[in-house]
Amino acid sequence: MSENRNGLMELLGGGSLVEYNDQAQKAVMQFEARPEFCHSDGRVVQGGFVTAWMDAAMAHAIRRASQGEYSAVTLELKVTFVSATGPGPVVAEGWVVSMGRTVAFLEGRLFDGAGKLLATSSSTAKLARVNP
């Protein structure tokens, strides 16, 4: 499976996959929370970016867990904002809780560069064949 970066990941602040654990079916990605992603005088990242970072990590977990056969199409996504996210490096984790033939259940977390928990997420995703 290709790990080529695409335009969306660049727009989200880099989006590089830094680790994948086969046993845990867990993807870890790093992003840069840029000042232009922020409101409140540049101190707080807009929640859509926080959500997208965790969604991307969960989608990578599906791609890897299925050996590149499936992509995740989000059906439902819940996010809990634990603490304000500021500019700087952030780490998104996403993992497969359960994967059936057509639907997967996923969870994710977002941390700042010091390891502080910023947000959590859970998602239900439809499995879509990458190359039908």
Predicted regions and their residues:
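Terminal targeting signals and extreme-terminal segments of soluble enzymes
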Residues: M1-P132
